[in-house]
Structure formats: C-alpha cells, structure tokens
C-alpha cells in the first residue's frame, strides 16, 4: 500500500513498527568495517562493498578468475549500518564522544536546565508518555572556558574528533591497489586546496582558518564527527520535521534513520507542530549525524504564531533549551536588516524564507532593527558555551529565478560576512546559507561573492533550483544547480525533495531527495578532483564492461532500484550473468561487441607477433641455435 493512501493512524502505526523492529542492516554484499586511529576508541565506520571476481580465461570445467578489490565508501548510517549492533530507539545510541568530552575537563554538568520552557515541559506529567526516558544531564563550558572545536584548533590542538574526520575523509582509499581503480582525471578546483592525503593537522588548520566547521555540540555525544568545508568532500543535508497538520514523533524518528541510511551527512529538524521539544529529544538521542534547527520556528510557536509578539527573551530561552538538548547548529536569520526589507518590494516572489519573513514582519511591525542582529554577540556567547555552530541564514534568498542575484540577496550576504567575523571573536564556528532559485549562468557569482564577502567560511545552499517550471521534479531542477555550485566550492548542499513547493515529504520523498543530492555532491567531488572520488566510478565501469551484474547493483547508490529495474525485463537468474541487457539484446550490446573487438585485436597482435618472429627466424638463416653474441 502506498504511504499516500494510508490514514494518519496507519502511518503512525507503520512508523512505530519500523522503530520497534529496527536493527543494524548492511547494504547488499556490503560489510561494516572500522578503521582505527591513534587511540583505541577512535574507530571510524566505513562501508566496504564486496565484489565478485572477473573471469579471465580457462575452460568451462576449470575457469580462471582474477579477484576484484572491495571498495570502501563513506558511511553516514552510524550504528544503523552495522548488523553487529543491537538497536534500541527507546535507549538511544551509544555516547561515542563522551570520553573525549570528559577528558578535556573544560565542561561541567548543570544542576538544572537553563531554559524556563524546558523546566516547564519536564514538570508536565501529561507529557510522560511522549518523553524520551533516558534524558541526559546537560553540560556547558566551565567559567572562563571555551569548548568549541574552533577554539581547540586555534590553540593548535588536534582533537580526537579531528583525527576521526581525517580518517573518514580519506575514505579508506589507501587500501586500493588496483591502478585501474586508482586512475583519476585531474579536476578543476577553482582555488580549493585538496591534499592527496588528509591528515588530522590539515583538519585542524582548516577549522582554525574558519574554512571548515565540525558541528559537534558537547550535549550530542552520540554523533559521529564530520566536517563541512570547501576542501573536503561535499556534504548533503536532509530536512525532516513535523508540521501543524501532519507527522508524529514516530514518523520523524523513522525519517531520521532513513535519512542516515541514504546518505544524509546532517539532518535539520524543522518541526513547527506540537511537541517540538519532545520530538527533538528523540531525534537527538538517536542521531549519529549532527542535527540542525531553526530556533525562530519554535520561538514563534511559544508566542502562538504571532511574529509581532516575538521577543529576545523568548528567543534566548529557546537557544538555551535547544543547546542543552544537543542541537549541533542553529540557523539564525540575523542578516535580515530593517533597511533591506524594502529592497524586496520589487521582487516577483518577495521574501520566501520562512525565517526571513518572520523577522521582516517583526522589523516592520516594530520599526526596529532585527533583534537577532542586535543581540548577536549574546547569541555567540551561548553557542561558545556548548559548541553550537552557527549557520547564518539567507532570509532574503531569491524564491524565483527572476529575483536571483538581486540587491537584497547580496546586501544580506555582505552583512553575514560581518557577522562571521563577530562569531569568530568568540571562537564560534560559522557557515553561510545560500540560495535558492538561480539560473545556471548566474550560479558561479554566488560562490565568488560568498568567498569574498564571508572570508571563505563554508557555504551551504538549498539547490539552487535552475528553473521554476517543474513542480514535482524540483529535486531534478535543484540537483543541477547543486552539482554546479558544489563544483565551484560549496561545502554542503541542502536536499530538495519531489514535494518541494507542494507538501511535506514522506519517507520515499526523503530517499529520492537524498539520492539526487548524493549524485550532485559526488559529481562535484569528481569535477573538483577530490582524491579518490573516482574509485567507485571506475569499479562500476569495470563491472559494467565485464557484465558483473550483481556488482553493478551493489556499487550503485541505490542497489535496490538498480536491481528492480534490471529484473523488470530480465527477472531470471540467468539474466544476472548474461553478457547483455534488455535494452540492446545479445546481438547489439555495445559492451559485448567491444569485448569481441578487444579479443580480436589481441588475437591479431599475437598473429602479428608470430609473423614478426617467423620473419626474424628466416632473416637469421633459419638456424635453430644462435651464437651467444647474436642473442
């Protein structure tokens, strides 16, 4: 039954069943491996795709094979991708980073929650059935201390998180010996610095320079360290979250697990409905990837959805609430200034950012400057105490290609650059959010402007969508722009699902969006020339040429769909070993013909070689034995 035909009760029951029966699961013919670091507790997970051998000759009774190396790939699924790990959503994930956080001895447990709203929720017995049972006691920096990865990097410290990331970014490519797999075209990197081998010191230096961030709140010890930066692999974010009209805690946890399985490097919880606090707790305690939020959404819920009633005090309380739960990065729309709002009046689609429109409405109704801008230093102080990274929101991003690259968009971007420098004064990590809707020929300017205006802080974009004519297919229209801007230097791409502009995505939409954006990110890595990026492509091409169908399925980003499409027309097991597919059939398969041409050429070379030897034999007088000096 399609998810869209289920009732709300049935959807919740289905999600609950998914959670109750959840166990660590590997992709087909893959296994979880761990690469260890200098410390015994630095164990970096990767997925290793096992491949079948290549038939190279012999006879039917005595075939000869050549082994194909297993291909290691980056894995975001955390414990959910390890069949050896017992999963219990009620208890949450293991606290991977807790020993590292404790060993630094610069944070302390709080006697009570700092947020009045959190204290109110915890005191409400009516929420007991919804509440995650194993609540953590939150930590914050000790007085006079800073606990951010940027602070450590500037002090010259290589943290365990940085070593973990260095191993992870190398993707196990040092294991690959085959020259065929290691071959890679030189890329065009537009000034990015892409070392052949990523070291912990390189990670530290990039973070120290502000060119990369490690979103890792000390209250989210379950997360596996990852990095967002121009000189690393392009990352992908997935958005989940309930709304006032649909979705439940069970469904959001299901979407979280599903997102990490299909390659989400980070997940943003954009919940705006009931039980935001409780939903977020379940998500954080079960997330192996960093979690981001837009705090203004929840702050607005606290004032009954009336933007004019927002206050700095309510917003500050929300920041404390979320920081102590473990949110790894906040999207803050502090660049929507009062003087920029009139610039949007001549736009075709005005202000399309939800956070941007909230702050614009507040500014106009009070005729005051954006309180997020006015209190930005206080925001930084809060972030520094928990190591919450800032994602400076593009509240004035274009919502149509007609509005792309206009005065409002770039005015805000320049302000975000000023705010970046302020955040760095507090050792707070920063990335910059970008558009939006931009036609292809105008995309590169966005990257250039961001690098110049925002001092090379990582760029994080929503697409951009390259045309406005394809509702229902905006994962395609935006995937084109995402691949381009990723190539130009964008560090993280926020996925767009087929439901963009139409409705709240379900589980299948999340998968479609992620696959599309993993393609875009990988295409960008190839174009940049990221070391090792081509290994999987080469393995796939070799498997394709050798008609190793099972390996083709297993090397695919989505093995299940690849297999299903093949089996629609060749469902028999014999189709998995056939030297053709249903598109061309046995007589017109280009790969099969190419193999025959190669075999013929090899045979011809042998014949030519034998003819040359024969001619040489005759030229030397037909002697069977030659004198020593003639040899």
UniProtKB/Swiss-Prot annotation:
Enzyme Commission code: 4.1.99.17
InterPro entries the record matches: ThiC (IPR037509), ThiC-associated_dom (IPR025747), ThiC/Bza_core_dom (IPR038521), ThiC/BzaA/B (IPR002817)
Pathway entry: Cofactor biosynthesis; thiamine diphosphate biosynthesis
Source organism of this protein record: Salmonella choleraesuis (strain SC-B67)
Record text on subunit structure and interactions: Homodimer.
Taxon lineage: Bacteria, Pseudomonadati, Pseudomonadota, Gammaproteobacteria, Enterobacterales
Family: Belongs to the ThiC family.
Keyword set includes Lyase: yes
GO biological process: thiamine biosynthetic process; thiamine diphosphate biosynthetic process
Pfam families: ThiC-associated, ThiC_Rad_SAM
Role noted for this protein: Catalyzes the synthesis of the hydroxymethylpyrimidine phosphate (HMP-P) moiety of thiamine from aminoimidazole ribotide (AIR) in a radical S-adenosyl-L-methionine (SAM)-dependent reaction.
Keyword vocabulary terms for this entry: 4Fe-4S, Iron, Iron-sulfur, Lyase, Metal-binding, S-adenosyl-L-methionine, Thiamine biosynthesis, Zinc
Entry keyword Metal-binding: yes
Residues that coordinate or bind Zn(2+): 437, 501
GO cellular component: cytosol
Protein name as annotated: Phosphomethylpyrimidine synthase
Catalytic activity: 5-amino-1-(5-phospho-beta-D-ribosyl)imidazole + S-adenosyl-L-methionine = 4-amino-2-methyl-5-(phosphooxymethyl)pyrimidine + CO + 5'-deoxyadenosine + formate + L-methionine + 3 H(+)
């Amino acid at each position: 039954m399609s998810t869209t035909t289920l009732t709300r009760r049935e959807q919740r029951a289905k999600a609950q069943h998914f959670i109750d029966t959840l166990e660590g699961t590997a992709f087909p013919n893959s296994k979880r491996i761990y690469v260890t670091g200098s410390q015994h507790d630095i164990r970096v997970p990767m997925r290793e795709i096992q491949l079948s051998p290549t038939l190279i000759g012999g006879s039917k009774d005595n075939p000869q094979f050549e082994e194909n190396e297993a291909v290691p790939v980056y894995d975001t699924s955390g414990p959910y991708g390890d069949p050896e790990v017992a999963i219990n959503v009620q208890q949450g994930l293991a606290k991977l980073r807790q020993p590292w956080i404790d060993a630094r001895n610069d944070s302390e447990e709080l006697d009570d929650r700092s947020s009045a709203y959190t204290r109110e929720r915890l005191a409400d017995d009516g929420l007991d059935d919804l509440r995650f049972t194993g609540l953590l006691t939150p930590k914050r920096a000790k007085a006079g201390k800073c606990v951010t990865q940027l602070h450590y990097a500037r002090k010259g410290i290589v943290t365990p998180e940085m070593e973990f990331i260095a191993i992870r970014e190398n993707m196990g490519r040092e294991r690959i010996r085959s020259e065929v797999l290691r071959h890679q075209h030189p890329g065009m990197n537009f000034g990015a610095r892409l070392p052949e081998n990523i070291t912990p010191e390189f990670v530290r230096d990039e973070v120290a320079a502000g060119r990369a961030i490690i979103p890792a709140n000390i209250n989210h010890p379950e997360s596996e360290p990852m990095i967002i930066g121009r000189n690393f692999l392009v990352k992908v974010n997935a958005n989940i979250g309930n709304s006032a009209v649909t979705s439940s805690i069970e469904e959001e946890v299901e979407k979280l697990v599903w997102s990490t399985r299909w390659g989400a490097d980070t997940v943003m919880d954009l919940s705006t409905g009931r039980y935001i606090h409780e939903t977020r707790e379940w998500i954080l305690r079960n997330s192996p990837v960093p979690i981001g939020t837009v705090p203004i959404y929840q702050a607005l819920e606290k004032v009954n959805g009336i933007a004019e009633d927002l206050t700095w005090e309510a917003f500050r309380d929300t920041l404390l609430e979320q920081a102590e739960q473990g949110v790894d990065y906040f999207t803050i729309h502090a660049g929507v200034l009062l003087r920029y709002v009139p610039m949007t009046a001549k736009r075709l689609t005005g202000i399309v950012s939800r956070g941007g429109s909230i702050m614009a409405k507040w500014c106009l109704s009070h005729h005051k400057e954006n309180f997020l801008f006015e209190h930005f230093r206080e925001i930084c102080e809060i972030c520094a105490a928990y190591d919450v990274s800032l994602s400076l929101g593009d509240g004035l991003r274009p919502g149509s290609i007609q509005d792309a690259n206009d005065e409002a968009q770039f005015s805000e971007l320049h302000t975000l650059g000023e705010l970046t420098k302020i955040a760095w004064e507090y050792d707070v990590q920063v990335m910059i959010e970008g558009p939006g809707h931009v036609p292809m020929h105008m995309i590169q300017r966005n990257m250039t402007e961001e690098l110049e205006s925002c001092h090379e802080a990582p760029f994080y974009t929503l697409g951009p969508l390259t045309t406005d004519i394809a509702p229902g297919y905006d994962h395609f229209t935006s995937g084109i722009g995402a691949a381009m801007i990723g190539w130009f230097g964008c560090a993280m791409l926020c996925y767009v699902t087929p439901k963009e502009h139409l409705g709240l995505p379900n589980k299948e939409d999340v998968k479609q969006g992620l696959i599309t954006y993993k393609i875009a990110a990988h295409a960008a890595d190839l174009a940049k020339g990221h070391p090792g990026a081509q290994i999987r492509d080469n393995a796939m091409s070799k498997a394709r040429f050798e008609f190793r169908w099972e390996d083709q399925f297993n090397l695919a980003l989505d093995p299940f769909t690849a297999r299903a499409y093949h089996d629609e027309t060749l469902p028999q097991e014999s189709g998995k070993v056939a030297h053709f597919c249903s598109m061309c059939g046995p007589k017109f398969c280009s790969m099969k013909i190419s193999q025959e041409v190669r075999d013929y050429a090899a045979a011809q070379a042998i014949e030519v070689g034998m003819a040359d030897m024969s001619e040489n034999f005759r030229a030397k007088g037909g002697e069977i034995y030659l004198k020593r000096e003639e040899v």
